[in-house]
């Protein structure tokens, strides 16, 4: 209940700011959806980069009892793990979400996290868009009662959608933690694109009725 109170009190403001288009490939032979999926990855990483540039090292690594003793760095490293693992698997092979390291330099050093983010942006910008349609197997431990992991068929594009949505939810938690520490979180940070769209439509409808 304490965390839920913090979520209510300190959630970052939801501003109807559209996610900017950061990257547009000149390859017009790939589906428009592939262009948009790649743009969503780049925009999400750029949001993280902006946040890291605005907070201090101490705020990045501070562990908060109200957030299960987690840190912004821990949540952010977790997001980058998914984008990095997916990028590597997109080029060749299958994807295993369980193959991640915890307590790394990215989690404990803000500048290392900034550099890792920028490297990922470059990697995703160079990705051949046709790869997003590639089918592969995804492994992740989802069952508490078993010792093994579970595997399912998927596609790179489908996992891009998951990685972005996953990051947005962790960004929301990061926003809560930043609010607890009194930080000014960028407007729209941790707000889902569908939520921003809904807010825009609601505001437009309210304006039209006045």
Language-model region placement:
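Short, helix-capping/interhelical loops that line the mouth of catalytic, cofactor-
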Residues: 27-32, 81-126, 132-148, 183-210
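Short conserved catalytic/interaction loops centered on acidic-Pro-aromatic/His motifs
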Residues: 171-189
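Short hydrophobic alpha-helical segments enriched in small aliphatic residues
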Residues: 9-11
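Polybasic, lysine-rich low-complexity intrinsically disordered segments
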Residues: 5-6
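Extreme N-terminal tail/first-helix region
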Residues: 24-46
